[in-house]
Amino acid sequence: MTPPPIRFGYKASAEQFGPSELADLAVAAEEHGFDSVFISDHLQPWRHDGGHAPASLPWLGAVGARTQRVILGTSVLTPTIRYHPGVIAQAFATLGSMYPGRIVLGVGTGESLNEVPLGLAWPEQKERFARLKESVNLIHELWTGERVTFEGEYYRTDKATIYDRPADPVPIYIGASGPAATRLAGRIADGFITTSGKAPSLYTDTLLPALRDGVEKAGRRLDELDTLMEMKVSFDTDRERAMQDTRFWAALALKPEQKAGVEDPLEMQRLADELPIEQAASRWIVSDDPDEHVEKIRTYLDLGFRHLVFHAPGHDQQRFLALYGEQILPRLRALVGQG
């Protein structure tokens, strides 16, 4: 089997822009040479002021109609609490039928701020993981069978059929930041998603070994999977501007214990705004020099990630896309032999 090609994608900042502007940015990403566009699926954003949270499912359908070649997917959607897995199976089968070969379902265990505000219980991590595993198995069954009766611990179906589905099932990627979900991705998923800007040892000593372990236990090869790194990058010709742009996304620099149990965007915003700019920017590759920027990105290619999806924090995303299209993507493609 041929390994997936190296791809460079764009993360549409759904927590920062409304749906129409975000769709325009996705179209621009294709025009500037990006290979994919991924969107999160939040009910609520990380901050209240200036925050947005468009629904990913209608947005993907609309953007599919306005683009020609980019892969479109979620990074990530939680198919376990506010959605029944069967609803997600139907939605992505429809998207896959309309845009064959271009749709990816990226899933994860989720965030409490997207579930608790709807009056839904937020389970412990062990249950969230079990729900994710069961939901992926159910989605696979619904995509390959007919009149599916499923009796799981958390979900059930009774002679359910997804009537409209693509010739080839939509790939499922599992997002993870810990070993258990990463191992699960290696066992049952078509791809693995994680995020940049954390301790290097997390990738070298924990996540990648867990991924290889899952792949080997399933009798698969690692190069059968698409390994996607969501890259946190802030690139501008003005380094100070690149640094200050990270402020909007300061919540990403909060430690897990700092944001545990925080479901209100106003409270998340308050906590994030207390961080000094150096900490707010700590997850991001902040650069004004293209060669320096590419060299830092190269670290993740050297780890073996084959699909880098770039998430920029600034408010002027058209500027980012133009700068990346002109200065960064050509260097990256030359680096991997695509120039």
UniProtKB/Swiss-Prot annotation:
PANTHER family reported for this sequence: 5,10-METHYLENETETRAHYDROMETHANOPTERIN REDUCTASE (PTHR43244:SF1), PTHR43244
Subunit structure: Homodimer.
Family: Belongs to the F420-dependent glucose-6-phosphate dehydrogenase family.
EC number: 1.1.98.2
Active site: 42 (proton donor), 111 (proton acceptor)
Pfam families: Bac_luciferase (PF00296)
Function description: Catalyzes the coenzyme F420-dependent oxidation of glucose 6-phosphate (G6P) to 6-phosphogluconolactone.
Catalyzed reaction equations: oxidized coenzyme F420-(gamma-L-Glu)(n) + D-glucose 6-phosphate + H(+) = 6-phospho-D-glucono-1,5-lactone + reduced coenzyme F420-(gamma-L-Glu)(n)
Keywords: Carbohydrate metabolism, Oxidoreductase
Biological processes annotated in GO: carbohydrate metabolic process
Residues noted as binding coenzyme F420-(gamma-Glu)n in the record, renumbered to the chain: 41, 78, 109-110, 114, 177-178, 180-181
Domain of life: Bacteria
Binding site for substrate: 195, 198, 259, 283
Name under which the protein is recorded: F420-dependent glucose-6-phosphate dehydrogenase
InterPro entries reported for this sequence: F420-dep_G6P_DH, F420-G6PD/mer, F420_G6P_DH-rel, Luciferase-like_dom, Luciferase-like_sf
Molecular function as annotated in GO: coenzyme F420 binding; glucose-6-phosphate dehydrogenase (coenzyme F420) activity; oxidoreductase activity, acting on paired donors, with incorporation or reduction of molecular oxygen
SUPFAM superfamilies the record matches: Bacterial luciferase-like
Signal peptide residues on this chain, from the entry's feature table: none
